Amino acid sequence: MADLSPVLQPHREGGSRYGYTMFPGLECESEAELSLSLARTKTRSYGSTASVAAPLSERYIEHRLSPSDTLQGIALKYGVTMEQIKRANKLFSTDCIFLRKSLNIPVISKKGSLFNGLGSLDSPENETQDNCNSPTKEPALAEAHTVSIPSSAKTNQPIVRSDEELSAKDFLQRLDLQIKRSTQAAQRLKEEDLRHDDSYATCSYQH
């Protein structure tokens, strides 16, 4: 006689032979852990949508767009590539620039050029700022390297020297003065000894 009993499915781990779970709390906990792990994982992005962390030597300049602007012209103006502008602004194509009012232009500072071998990509605005700041730096350098000019007897103006020159001159003058005083004192002692010896010799000769 054939066995007409229903075929039982193999039971899962932690479940009974009839297909239902013996411990429903464990299954809920495993599902919660799975959802948390999926939430923690970051979605990958490729191409221009990838968020690349800017290095310490990179900064951005805001460029106001005009109807005649093109991506190639902006890249040539600031000395950067089109891909860098696309990556910085997350652009998919060159036509997307007309949907924006401004673009962020990545600019590499001079500090970064020492490490990666690339030239400085400063914009013309920064060049004008550097030119404006340079006249203020030149007088400071000139003051640091001023040559000592002797004061005239008529004007009695103080001698202009830098701090380093003044301290070195003072030190050398003091050293020369101390040497001169010590040599003079040694000569005086020597002369006094000679006089004392002469007086003692004359006194002994008279007696």
Swiss-Prot record:
Residues 188-199 have a biased composition (Basic and acidic residues). Residues 61-105 form the LysM domain. PANTHER family: AND PUTATIVE PEPTIDOGLYCAN-BINDING DOMAIN-CONTAINING PROTEIN 2-RELATED, LYSM AND PUTATIVE PEPTIDOGLYCAN-BINDING DOMAIN-CONTAINING PROTEIN. InterPro entries: LYSM1-4, LysM_dom, LysM_dom_sf. Pfam families: LysM. Residues 186-207 are annotated as: Disordered. This is LysM and putative peptidoglycan-binding domain-containing protein 2. The lineage of its organism: Eukaryota, Metazoa, Chordata, Craniata, Vertebrata. It comes from the Eukaryota. It comes from Xenopus tropicalis.
